[in-house]
Amino acid sequence: MPVVWDDVTRAEVLRAIQEYDRLGPEKFFSEHGFAPTTTYDLVWDERRYPPKAILGTAYEFATGQRLASGDFEGGKTGAVKVLGKLGFTVRPRQPAR
């Protein structure tokens, strides 16, 4: 069954970003059950975040239900699209320099 994103607002996404900043990547991924991004970056306040992990965590904050990474798509038709509708910028991932 597809995930319905109606309950997720900008506020939950920003809360997930704050959680990521507070915990750091490794602990965030461990606690929320996601992995680093490979294709896209959510760009906020000149920093880059893993869009699928941030959106999944925002969903958990909004609904109290935890999603697994396999429960929804992360690419253009998934997390990227949902985050864009909420007014966030998601860009193709740049190689590390």
Language model regions located:
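Intrinsically disordered, charged low-complexity linkers and terminal tails
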Residues: 1-97
